[in-house]
C-alpha cells in the first residue's frame, strides 16, 4: 500500500492475536491521541507559557473538531460535503494529521533559529537535517495530502525570505534538500495511482463544468484562515504564518 503507516500499525497488532476491528480501532485511536497531544503543545506555544493549561486543552479540543465554514445553501449537512468530517473518512488521513502539526512546528522552529542566530550559525546541523527529512518522508508515507498543501505554501514563504536574505542561501538549500525524500515518495505514489497499469489506480480527469464548484468548495474550507491572514498582517510568528498559509493552500 502506498500509504503504509496506518496499515503497518494494524498489521503489527494483528500479530498479537487481536481481531482486525479491534486492531484498526486501537491504531486509529492512537493517531487521534497523538494528534490531540500535538495540537495541545501547539496551542501552548501559540498562547504563551503564561496561559493556563486548560485553555490550551480547550483550544486543542476545538481544533480536533473544526471543519469548514457551514453555509446552509451550499453544505447543509455535517456528515456530507466538502471539507466536512464523516463516519467513512479515511483512517490514513487520521494518521497524517499528527505529522502535519509536527512538520509545521519543526519548520517554524528551524526558521526562527535561523533568524535568531543568523546565516552563519543558523544553518541546520546534520542531525537536524536528517530528522527533518525523515519527518517529512514519514508524513508522505502516512498520506501525501498534507504535503500537497504545505510544500507549495512553504516554498512561497521561503522564496520570499531567500530573496530578502540571499546571504542565507546555504540554509535554504538545506531545506530544499530535506524535502527531496518526501518528494520522491510522493512521485512514486503519483506513479502508482495515475500512471502504473494496475486495477487499483485512480483515473485523473479534468472537467471545466465542475471548476466553479471546486473553487467554491475550496473557498469554504479556506474562509477562516483567509480571514486570519487578512486581518492580522503584522503577525511575525513564523509558526502562525506557516500554519495559515498551509490552511489557505
PLM feature spans:
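Short hydrophobic/aromatic helix or loop-helix immediately within or flanking a transmembrane segment
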Residues: 1-19
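Transmembrane catalytic cores of multi-pass membrane glycosyltransferases
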Residues: 3, 144-150, 158-249
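Transmembrane helix irregularities
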Residues: 16, 65-66, 138-145
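Transmembrane-helix motifs of polytopic, lipid-linked glycan transferases
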Residues: 26-50, 102
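Hydrophobic core segments of transmembrane alpha-helices in multi-pass, intramembrane catalytic enzymes
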Residues: 32, 93-104, 149, 153, ...
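Membrane-interfacial, low-structure loops and terminal tails that flank and connect transmembrane helices
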Residues: 47-50, 111-131, 165-171, 240
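Membrane-interface micro-motifs in multi-pass membrane enzymes
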Residues: 53-111, 211-218
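Membrane-interface alpha helices of multi-pass inner-membrane proteins
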Residues: 128-144, 155
Amino acid at each position: 500500500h502506498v500509504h503504509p503507516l496506518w496499515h503497518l500499525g494494524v498489521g503489527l497488532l494483528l500479530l498479537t492475536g487481536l481481531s482486525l476491528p479491534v486492531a484498526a480501532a486501537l491504531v486509529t485511536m492512537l493517531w487521534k491521541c497523538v494528534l490531540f497531544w500535538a495540537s495541545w503543545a501547539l496551542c501552548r506555544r501559540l498562547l504563551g507559557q503564561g496561559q493556563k493549561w486548560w485553555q490550551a486543552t480547550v483550544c486543542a479540543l476545538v481544533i480536533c473538531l473544526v471543519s469548514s465554514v457551514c453555509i446552509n445553501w451550499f453544505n447543509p449537512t455535517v456528515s456530507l460535503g466538502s471539507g466536512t468530517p464523516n463516519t467513512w473518512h479515511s483512517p490514513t488521513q487520521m494518521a497524517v494529521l499528527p505529522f502535519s502539526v509536527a512538520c509545521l512546528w519543526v519548520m517554524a522552529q528551524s526558521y526562527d533559529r535561523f533568524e535568531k542566530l543568523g546565516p552563519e550559525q543558523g544553518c541546520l546541523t546534520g542531525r537536524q537535517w536528517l530528522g527533518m527529512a525523515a519527518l517529512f518522508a514519514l508524513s508522505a508515507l502516512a498520506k501525501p495530502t498534507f504535503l500537497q498543501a504545505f510544500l507549495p505554501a512553504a516554498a512561497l514563504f521561503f522564496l520570499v525570505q531567500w530573496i530578502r536574505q540571499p546571504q542565507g542561501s546555504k540554509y535554504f538549500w538545506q531545506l530544499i534538500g530535506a524535502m527531496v525524500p518526501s518528494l520522491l515518495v510522493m512521485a512514486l505514489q503519483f506513479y502508482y495511482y495515475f500512471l502504473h497499469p494496475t486495477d487499483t489506480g485512480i483515473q485523473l480527469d479534468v472537467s471545466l463544468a465542475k471548476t466553479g464548484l471546486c473553487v467554491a468548495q475550496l473557498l469554504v474550507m479556506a474562509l477562516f484562515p483567509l480571514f486570519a491572514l487578512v486581518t492580522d498582517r503584522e503577525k511575525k510568528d513564523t509558526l502562525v504564518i506557516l500554519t495559515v498559509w498551509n490552511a489557505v493552500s
